[in-house]
UniProtKB/Swiss-Prot annotation:
The keyword Disulfide bond applies. One of its GO terms (biological process) is pilus assembly. Residues 1-21 form the signal peptide. The gene is fasD. This is Outer membrane usher protein FasD. Belongs to the fimbrial export usher family. GO terms for molecular function: fimbrial usher porin activity.
Length: 835
């Protein structure tokens, strides 16, 4: 690795990143002690992107997506600009197999890469230490599907995590009172990339009245306990414990055992949901613009010839794509590509799988018909033209199932999927063999605003058993074995009404074998907003009928409206309050509720007051509650009066992370991992991603996205003047669930302008680098042409180190105790001799 004096290191960015062709820099202008004898060749700075060759730590991005942090060697290319040299194997699995011949070389230059990858590009930005590699989609390999390289993931530190919620209430009524308490916690423990998670709760209840002395009854439970670890090179996660299957074709089920599955969270965001491949031909260097619903979702330059584009993401399940191609001469041509999708659809070339092994586990059933172990496996892969093939199988001693399915894009007619499953169940010494068939359909009609989000139909023969049907047993419902699902139909429909809001319809019906039991549900709602006023109406029907069930028809009508209080009083007000009214009719009972809610001025609290009344006796109620949303704790306190009942309720919730020698507390959930900002036990430092450091000098940041680069920035605008932060922005690439400490070096001290001279009385050379000894060179400044340097965060006494040229340096001791300062804003002048 090449070594250079500090001054040249500082100048690499200052000169190289702003140079233009033909610039020339006189070495004598840089520092008086860097002369001709040193024979420095500064011509490398006279080219755009020029600089000193050698190793650098950089962030590598592929097609504008973060890939990894790595140390690369750099050399000056033919143009004079710095170009990275990649190690052998760097492009393994980044490039598709026909373009991997470069991996056989020990070192891969930028020129090697460009010669083998058509339309490829490499760009280095010295100022931010970033290397951008552009690779056409057709040439990308498996690793390019991932958010980042697994070797860049941060497993975090050993840590104990907890999310907790405590709640309770006390109810006083005519002849007595009752109390209940509920505590719920999500617990986690991380060690060497393994993550243990479990959920626990405690419930207690007691009641006092004329016949009850008030004995407390309580219960304590653990559930959903599992251990997991990521396997990056497989894009997978291994999980052991209390789990559930994916349920790709039929419904999922709970079990105890283990599974390994492809983790879609590791996928590049653009590949996590299905998006069609846009294909076309450009006659020249052209700009392709793709719109959906009038919104530009991608604009990309393409070279002459055929092109394929699929590196973009879409929201929703449908919506035609409008593709415009603008040629170099200004001419344009366009076409429409219909687009509809289904949840099962995957991007072309993206696969998914799951393999599970264990015993059935359903806490709702006291016993099972059969408890033999099972094997579950599923697989899916996306192909061209919106086709995704998928399958699943279950193999057990007395039960076997095989299911296959496929999706298909129908262009203007939407998207459809179909599946078929065969089951064989040996139950009560009798063989039952049956089939189940399913259809799904999705379509978006842009010009009318109609979206059939999902229409499904499933039919099962009389002898078809799902695994839940076969294994579960509940003695209280003996007929359940003969009451298996026969068919089910569901519909979800949305209709845009433009300025008049939107209309939504959800309906379903299902019936069963050997029974006329029918279950129906229907929901219709309409909502729209006008001038900050919101309206919503709804109707729902829940109907159950049949020989084995009481006829039950629940009809619910609802109306809701809200308006900002400022609209009513005609001016802005500090509480940002909203007045709302809600009315519901459930069969023959009508309930009305009026609510006023807003913020408590000058605090992190919100209030809510409501009054309710109905068309039944003693049904009126009034309620008042206050909620607190803090950085360290959330809480609420409420009081409700209903008839002769008086109810007081409360809740507290928050989170904590305990890791080596430190503790961090917060209000947001940490069970899925977090970054912990450390600021040398200094409190009150705000984090731009949310929160601020507590008295412990820590702040929890839970907005981190796993498997990709995240920035964490301190807010330096509001820190005290006697604090200095050398680097207020840091980056991490966490695994999911990881606890990653992010330490910031803060220096508490004074603001000083040092005037430094050498032993002969001459000022230190212009451009000399001065740093505080013991600060790891984080408190550093550059001498100006008068021999002065400004430094912040300076203690009362210490030593400064100055360096210039090759092996030219000196040190000066300082003591500021004799330099009184009335406030931290004052800048102190200090003169010293550097020896």
């Amino acid at each position: 690795m090449n070594k250079y004096p500090p001054l040249l290191t500082m100048l690499i960015i200052g000169i190289g990143s702003n140079a233009v062709a033909g610039d020339y820099f006189d070495p004598s202008l840089l520092a008086t002690d860097i002369g001709n004898n040193d024979k420095l060749d500064l011509s490398l700075f006279s080219h755009p992107g020029g600089g000193v060759k050698g190793e650098r730590e950089v962030s590598v991005y592929i097609n504008d997506f973060f890939y990894k942090n790595v140390t690369l060697d750099f050399e000056n290319g033919i143009s004079g600009a710095l170009e990275p040299i990649f190690p052998s194997g760097f492009f393994d699995n980044i490039l598709a197999s026909p373009y991997r011949s470069i991996k056989e070389k020990e070192l891969i230059s930028t020129a090697d890469f460009l010669s083998l990858v058509p339309y490829g590009m490499v760009r280095f930005d010295q100022a931010i230490a970033r290397v951008d590699i552009s690779i056409p989609q057709a040439y990308l390999g498996r690793d390019a599907q991932m958010k980042s390289a697994p070797e860049s993931w941060n497993q975090g530190v050993p840590a104990l995590l907890i999310d907790y919620r405590l709640s309770g209430s006390k109810n006083k009524y005519n002849y007595g009172s009752s109390q209940n308490f509920y505590a719920n916690a999500f617990l986690g423990f991380n060690l060497m990339g393994w993550r243990l998670r479990t959920t626990t709760n405690y419930m207690s209840y007691n009641s006092k009245d004329l016949y009850n002395k008030g004995e407390r009854q309580g219960s304590f439970n653990f559930y959903n306990t599992y251990l997991e670890k990521d396997i990056g090179y497989l894009r997978s996660t291994l999980r052991l414990g209390e789990l559930s299957t994916r349920g790709m074709i039929l419904e999922s089920f709970n079990f105890k055992g283990g599974k390994i599955y492809s983790n879609d969270e590791m996928l590049n965001d653009r590949l996590r949901s299905y998006t069609p491949t846009v294909r076309g031909i450009a006659s020249s260097q052209a700009v392709v613009t793709i719109k959906q619903g009038g919104v530009v979702i991608l604009q990309k330059n393409v070279p002459p010839g055929p092109f394929e584009i699929n590196d973009f993401s879409l929201s929703g399940y449908s919506g035609d794509l409008y593709v415009n191609i603008k040629e170099a001469d200004g001419s344009e041509h366009s076409f429409i590509q219909p687009f509809s999708t289904l949840p099962e659809m995957k991007r072309e070339g993206v696969s998914g799988y799951e393999i599970s092994l264990g015993h059935y586990n359903n806490s709702g059933a006291t016993q099972y018909y059969n408890e033999s172990p099972f094997l579950y496996a599923s697989w899916s892969r996306g192909y061209r033209n919106g086709m995704t093939l998928y399958s699943e199988t279950i193999q057990s001693r007395k039960y076997q199932l095989l299911g296959v399915g496929s999706t298909l894009s129908l262009g203007d007619f939407g998207a459809v999927s179909g599946d078929a499953s065969l089951s064989r169940a040996n139950k009560y010494d009798k063989i039952h063999s049956g089939q189940s068939y399913g259809l799904k359909y999705s379509k978006n009609k842009v010009d009318t605003g109609t979206t059939v989000t999902l229409a499904t139909y499933r039919y099962s023969t009389k002898d078809f058993y799902s695994f839940n049907d076969f294994v579960s047993k509940n003695d209280s419902v003996q007929y359940v074995w003969d009451n298996r699902l026969k068919n089910r139909i569901t519909l979800s429909l949305n209709q845009s009404l433009d300025d008049y809001g939107s209309l939504s319809l959800i309906a379903s019906q299902q019936n069963y074998w050997t029974s006329d039991y029918v279950s129906r549900s229907f929901s219709l709602s309409h909502s729209f907003g006008w001038n900050d006023i919101f309206f919503s109406t709804s109707f729902s029907l829940d109907q159950k009928e049949g020989d084995n069930a009481l006829r039950n028809n629940n009809k619910v009508f609802g109306f809701y409206s809200s308006i900002p209080l400022s609209k009513l009083i005609g001016k802005n007000e500090s509480t940002y309050s909203t007045l709302s009214y809600n009315v519901t009719k459930i069969n023959n009972q009508v309930r009305n509720t009026a609510t006023l809610a807003g913020k408590v001025p000058g605090s992190m609290a919100q209030y809510r007051f409501s009054s309710g009344w109905a068309n039944t006796e003693q049904s009126s109620n009034k309620a008042l509650s206050v909620n607190w949303d803090g950085d360290l704790l959330d809480g609420s306190l409420g009081y409700t009066s209903s008839g002769k009942n008086r109810i007081t309720d409360y809740s507290l919730s928050g989170s904590a992370i305990l890791y080596p020698w430190r503790l961090a507390i917060g209000s947001d959930s940490v069970i899925n991992g977090a970054a912990v900002v450390e600021t040398e036990f200094i409190s009150g430092i705000k984090v731009r991603q949310g929160g601020e450091t507590s008295l412990l000098g820590t702040a929890i940041v839970t907005s981190m996205q796993p498997y990709t680069e995240n920035r964490i920035d301190l807010d330096t605008q509001n820190i005290p003047d006697d604090l200095f932060i050398s680097n207020a922005s840091k980056k991490i690439v966490p695994e999911k669930g990881a606890v990653v400490p992010v330490k910031y070096n803060l220096f508490k001290g004074k603001q000083i302008v040092f005037s430094l001279k050498r032993y002969d009385g001459t000022p230190l050379p212009f451009g000399s680098v001065v740093s505080l000894v013991g600060s790891d060179s984080e408190i550093t400044g550059i001498i100006d042409d008068a021999g002065r340097v400004y430094l912040a965060g300076i203690p009362s006494k210490g030593i400064l180190h100055g360096a210039w040229g090759y092996n030219k340096s000196c040190e000066v001791s300082f003591n500021l105790n004799g330099k009184p300062s009335n406030n931290s804003n004052e800048i102190i002048e200090y003169e010293g001799v550097c020896k």
